[in-house]
């Protein structure tokens, strides 16, 4: 089994705001894709079907509501029990998160994922973690005009999700790990020093 490895967490440069994905997606785009998912997508579509069809954090239909991947998902507004209950209805717990006095912890199953990248960005208004990756099947050759996969039918190549962090998260110190064998992503987000000290004082 491939070892669990650390992922270099890139920090966005410039004004601190990560760029939005270039292609705004519509629900009917995914509806037609899901109807024809039986072939051509990562091992006869099993990986994409597992992610898109079972309430994964990376599903465009998370909790029955369409999420454009350009929109940051406020994961921390959900109680863990509520989040997991929705996923258990699909008979697969694909995401978990927890909070301690010192950090936030996110763990997500990404079936069929073979590569995972994490980028963090932030400013005074919002702190966002961008998670993206590729399916195990080799992606098709890039288009001749040089556009990257985020500009086209990205769901045939991989997955993406933007996760909004809470205000007390120290976004500059995010750590990420990925298990290539199990497709398990782990992200640790330490709390800021002031938040940590306040929690310790009230303990």
Swiss-Prot record:
- Which GO terms of the cellular component aspect does the record hold? cytoplasm
Quote the subcellular location field of this record: Cytoplasm
Q: Which organism is it from?
A: Oryza sativa subsp. japonica
* Annotated GO biological process: response to heat
Q: Does the keyword Methyltransferase apply?
A: no
Organism superkingdom: Eukaryota
Print the organism lineage.
Eukaryota, Viridiplantae, Streptophyta, Embryophyta, Tracheophyta
Protein name stated in the entry: 22.3 kDa class VI heat shock protein
Q: Name one Pfam family in it.
A: HSP20
List, alphabetically, the Gene3D superfamilies matched: 2.60.40.790
What does the UniProt keyword field contain?
Cytoplasm, Stress response
């Amino acid at each position: 089994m491939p070892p669990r490895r650390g992922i270099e967490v890139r920090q966005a440069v410039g004004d601190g705001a990560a760029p939005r994905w270039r292609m705004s997606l519509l629900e009917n785009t995914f509806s037609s894709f899901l109807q024809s998912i039986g072939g051509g997508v990562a091992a006869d579509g099993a990986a994409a079907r597992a992610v898109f069809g079972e309430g994964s954090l990376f599903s465009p239909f998370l909790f029955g509501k369409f999420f454009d991947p350009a929109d940051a998902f406020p994961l921390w507004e959900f109680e863990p029990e509520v989040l997991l209950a929705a996923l258990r209805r699909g008979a697969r717990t694909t995401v978990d998160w927890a909070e301690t006095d010192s950090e936030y912890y996110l763990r997500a199953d990404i079936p069929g994922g073979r590569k995972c990248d994490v980028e963090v960005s932030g400013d005074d208004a919002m702190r966002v973690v961008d998670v993206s990756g590729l399916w195990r099947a080799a992606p098709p050759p890039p288009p001749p005009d040089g556009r990257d996969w985020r500009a086209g039918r990205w769901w045939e190549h991989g997955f993406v999700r933007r996760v909004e962090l809470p205000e007390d998260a120290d976004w500059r110190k995010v750590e990420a790990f990925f298990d290539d064998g199990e497709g398990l992503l782990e992200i640790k987000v330490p709390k800021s020093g002031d938040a940590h000290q306040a929690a310790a004082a009230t303990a």
